[in-house]
Amino acid sequence: MMRGNIAQLMQQAQKMQENLQRAQEELAKLEVTGSAGGSMVSVILSGTKECRKVRIDPSILNDQEMIEDLIAAAFNDASNKVDAESKERMGSATLGMSLPPGFKLPF
């Protein structure tokens, strides 16, 4: 009986690993836009939080301090969106898997 439980657990672990790998591949392709200042500044991040693009409205180019603040805010907005998307996708990758009590994934 114990052998059957171990085999089932190993199958679940393999399926979970495949699902997690697929979710990580999807995240690498993901692009998320964060914005600030009524979209005067926007930042596009990949699912791995690599900055792909920064857009700045020309009307604020003379205000360096505002630009700096808005870039930071837009980056943080995009970063929070990546975190939420990552949590959702990684959570759905383990959906239906019966994990032992207290078992937590590293994300």
Curated annotation (Swiss-Prot):
UniProt GO MF annotations: DNA binding
Q: Does the keyword Cell inner membrane apply?
A: no
Q: Where in the cell is it found?
A: Cytoplasm, Nucleoid
Key words of the record: Cytoplasm, DNA-binding
Which InterPro entries does this UniProt record tie to the protein? YbaB-like_sf, YbaB/EbfC
Record's signal peptide = none
Q: Does the keyword Transferase apply?
A: no
Q: Which terms in the GO cellular component ontology are assigned?
A: bacterial nucleoid; cytosol
> What job does the chain carry out?
Binds to DNA and alters its conformation. May be involved in regulation of gene expression, nucleoid organization and DNA protection.
Family listed: Belongs to the YbaB/EbfC family.
Subunit structure, interactors included: Homodimer.
UniProt cross-references to HAMAP family, sorted A to Z: DNA_YbaB_EbfC
The protein in question is named Nucleoid-associated protein Xfasm12_1216
